[in-house]
Each structure stands twice: as structure tokens, then as C-alpha cells.
Regions:
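Primary mode marks residue(s) on the alpha4-beta5-alpha5 output face of response regulator receiver
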Residues: 1-47, 51-163, 170-183
Length: 183
């Protein structure tokens, strides 16, 4: 998963005993494409299939400027960020996603600020940072042990992917590997 452009903060009230800065971005599914403007910029169709959320214009040629000028599927209409993940496939066909919920959490007793325009990040190790759950009414009923261990959801259960990104940022908007500026 990757992201670009600038998220806009929305305050979330937390319990008094656990103060920390946080904001949440909720975005509906936008589109599917074999593009990745961070890993393969300007190279249309060079990536594996991705499912995009948030910015509706995201493609291999996306720039900060093009993202800022486009519309969004996010609940916060000023959030022009682009979020994408590899497409989940069943029998060679992509599974239609519903939404992406992105949480930005600060350290305890610290504030959270919006990331700057042009911020880019790719998660470095999919298996080390990804797990799956089956959920009913937002409550996990099953949980995987890693990215390759996808549980079988039944009945009213919905499959949910969870991707954890690095959390200590050095202030740069990008790095040559798109990961080392956040550890």
C-alpha cells in the first residue's frame, strides 16, 4: 500500500486515560489499474493490479498537482490523498473492495499533524506488516497470522486487510526506496 498528497486531520475523541494524537480517513473504493505512481512513475500498466481509494484520478502519471486538482471518495472532501493496495483476487478475478479506513496515530501525549503535500510511502515488508481478519459488525471473529494466511469468512463475515506502516518519520516527503524516510 502507498499514499500520496496530503491528508486532512479530523479529530477523534479518545479516552482520558490514553491521550494521543490521532485522525482517521475513511475512503470508498475508486478504481482498479495496473499502475503505481510511486514505484513505477510514468509507466502505465507496468505494475501488478492495484485497487485505489480516495483520489479518483490516481494513475501512473499522477503528481502532487494532479492529485490536488482531482476529486476524492474520502469522507473529508479536502483530502486529496491516494491510497492503494494490491488487488485481492479469487479465481483470477478481483474482489470488489468496499472502503479503506486509514488511521494516523501519534505517540502518547503527542499531537498529530497533516503530512505535507507530496508525501510518499510504501510499506517495506508485506508479510511482516499485513494481517487479515473476518469481521461481523466491526468485531473480528477470525485473525490470520500473516499476509499469506487469509482466513475463510462465512455468512455475514467481511474480510478485512490490515496493513501497518512504519511510524517514525524524519520529515522528508520521500526517499530513494520510498520507505527509509519513515522507520
Amino acid at each position: 500500500p502507498t499514499l500520496a498528497a496530503t491528508p486532512v486531520a479530523r479529530a477523534v475523541k479518545l479516552l482520558p486515560e490514553a491521550p494521543r494524537g490521532i485522525f482517521v480517513v475513511g475512503c470508498r473504493f475508486s478504481h482498479t489499474a495496473s499502475d503505481d505512481p510511486i514505484v513505477h512513475p510514468g509507466m502505465t500498466g507496468m505494475s501488478h493490479l492495484h485497487q485505489f481509494f480516495g483520489n479518483t484520478s490516481t494513475n501512473a502519471n499522477s503528481t502532487t498537482e494532479s492529485l490536488l486538482g482531482a476529486s476524492t471518495t474520502c469522507g473529508e472532501k479536502n483530502d486529496k490523498s491516494a491510497y492503494w493496495v494490491p488487488a485481492l483476487m479469487v479465481n483470477g478475478q478481483p474482489v470488489a473492495p468496499i472502503r479503506a479506513s486509514v488511521y494516523y496515530r501519534g505517540a502518547k501525549n503527542k499531537s498529530v499533524r497533516a503530512l505535507p503535500n507530496g508525501f510518499k510511502l510504501v510499506t517495506p515488508r508485506g508479510d511482516a506488516t499485513t494481517f487479515w481478519t473476518c469481521k461481523v459488525g466491526g468485531v473480528a471473529t477470525k485473525r490470520s497470522t500473516g499476509a499469506g494466511d487469509v482466513p475463510t469468512c462465512t455468512g455475514d463475515e467481511q474480510l478485512s486487510a490490515h496493513v501497518r506502516f512504519q511510524s517514525c518519520w524524519n520529515g522528508a516527503t520521500d526517499s530513494s526506496d520510498h520507505t527509509s524516510h519513515v522507520v
